[in-house]
Structures are given as structure tokens and as C-alpha cells.
């Protein structure tokens, strides 16, 4: 009896060792809250709204198991930069961190509103006269598969807003490369 019990225990121990534990799957970022900014993903030619003079190229990628969106902003003139955006399930908010080739880091926070993505953050020196204040960016789909990024500035903590930039992201024309 003791011999059969020992044999049974050894057999179970051996079976447990031959079946390696499967690593836990990473958390999924496939829900609709993680897809709220997916319309911005793509290779883009960027123009001032209402004009046809190309000012930048921008590559927007969905990365890290669908949990992040990375922007690479490549202006034809001036400083480039990029951002990393993602949804935080703990807060229910979207966050974007912008880092440019000029010193400084800007953090934005917000979320979807009326089919658009609205992100707001404190941006030192971003005012029309170089003053510090809030910048609110609104991303929206527009006709022709394009995306509008409309920026507004507030020097009074969001009481009033004035336009600061307005870009249209059109799908990149690879024929012109």
C-alpha cells in the first residue's frame, strides 16, 4: 500500500513537471475604449486647414499589443517630435505625452467626445506671445479619409479659448515619393 501510494505520488509529480505552465497572456487592449483614436493611425501628409502647402509628414502607428499609439511628426521645416498616446483603464482617461526636438515634455489628458478625441494639457510657452497656458487638441475624422487636428490655447485656465493651430492629415501620397 505504501509502495503504491509512493508510486502514485511520483507519477503525479512527473506529470506535473512534463506539462510546462503556460505564460499568462498579456492583457488585451482590443476593447472600444482602446480604439477611440485608431482613426488617426496611418501615414499622413499634413497641411494647414484650407491650404495646399504641405508642412509635415506624420507616421502614426498602433503598437504594444494595441495599447499605444505612437506619432512621429516630421515637419518640412523646424523641429520634429513625437507623441505616445494610450488609454488608462484605471482612470478611464486617455493620456498623450509629446516630446519635441526642442527641450520640454507636454502631458495631455482627455478622451472621446461626440465622435472626436479631445486632449488638454499645460504647455509652457505655447501661447501666441510665448505665454504659458492650456492647449486643447481636438482630433476628428473629416471627409476623404482625412483627420483634422485643431488646437486651441487658453491663458485663463480654460475659461476662454483662442485658435492656435489647425491641421488636416491627408493619407500620404506614396506616388510622389
Segments and roles (model prediction):
Residues 1-12:
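Bacterial N-terminal signal peptides
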Amino acid at each position: 500500500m505504501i509502495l503504491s501510494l509512493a508510486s502514485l505520488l511520483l507519477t503525479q509529480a512527473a506529470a506535473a513537471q512534463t506539462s510546462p505552465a503556460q505564460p499568462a497572456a498579456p492583457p488585451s487592449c482590443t476593447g472600444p475604449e482602446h480604439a477611440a483614436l485608431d482613426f488617426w493611425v496611418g501615414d499622413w501628409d499634413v497641411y494647414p486647414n484650407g491650404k495646399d502647402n504641405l508642412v509635415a509628414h506624420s507616421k502614426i502607428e498602433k503598437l504594444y499589443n494595441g495599447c499605444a499609439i505612437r506619432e512621429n511628426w516630421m515637419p518640412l521645416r523646424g523641429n520634429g517630435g513625437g507623441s505616445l498616446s494610450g488609454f488608462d483603464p484605471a482612470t478611464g482617461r486617455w493620456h498623450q505625452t509629446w516630446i519635441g526636438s526642442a527641450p520640454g515634455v507636454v502631458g495631455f489628458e482627455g478622451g472621446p467626445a461626440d465622435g472626436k478625441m479631445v486632449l488638454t494639457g499645460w504647455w509652457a510657452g505655447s501661447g501666441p506671445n510665448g505665454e504659458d497656458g492650456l492647449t486643447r487638441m481636438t482630433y476628428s475624422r473629416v471627409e476623404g479619409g482625412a483627420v483634422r487636428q485643431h488646437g486651441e490655447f487658453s491663458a485663463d485656465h480654460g475659461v476662454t479659448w483662442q485658435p492656435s493651430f489647425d491641421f488636416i492629415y491627408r493619407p500620404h501620397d506614396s506616388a510622389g515619393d
